[in-house]
């Protein structure tokens, strides 16, 4: 089980990314717009750098919904491999079962 502080930190980052998403997109469009003046592009670059670091989606880490484990994460289920196996064995994940051939 991951520390509560790590799980909360990740939740805080998710909120921050959602909060600044539109602003980041607009600034990035301005920066990549070659028809805009160099001065405008430079201002947009400085504005983007002034945003909080945690507003960047690159800093997000996928974590298990139950344990908060960051490794062995299955995107399709939102669970780590350990919890996924446990849930499948209990029959909690529809359409998934243990392989047998």
UniProtKB/Swiss-Prot annotation:
Keywords: Ribonucleoprotein, Ribosomal protein, RNA-binding, rRNA-binding. It comes from the Bacteria. One of its GO terms (biological process) is translation. One of its GO terms (molecular function) is rRNA binding. GO terms for cellular component: cytoplasm; small ribosomal subunit. The keyword Ribonucleoprotein applies. Belongs to the universal ribosomal protein uS14 family. NCBIfam families: PRK08881.1 (NF006477). Binds 16S rRNA, required for the assembly of 30S particles and may also be responsible for determining the conformation of the 16S rRNA at the A site. Part of the 30S ribosomal subunit. Contacts proteins S3 and S10. This is Small ribosomal subunit protein uS14. It comes from Psychrobacter arcticus (strain DSM 17307 / VKM B-2377 / 273-4).
């Amino acid at each position: 089980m991951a520390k509560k502080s790590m799980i909360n930190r990740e939740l805080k980052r998710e909120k921050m990314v959602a909060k600044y998403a539109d602003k980041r997109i607009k600034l990035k469009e301005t920066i990549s717009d070659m028809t805009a003046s160099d001065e405008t592009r430079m201002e947009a670059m400085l504005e983007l750098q002034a945003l909080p670091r945690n507003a960047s989606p690159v800093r997000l880490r996928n974590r298990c919904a139950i344990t908060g484990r960051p490794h062995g994460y299955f995107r399709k289920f939102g669970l780590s491999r350990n919890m996924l196996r446990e849930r499948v064995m209990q029959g909690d994940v529809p359409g998934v079962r243990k392989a047998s051939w």
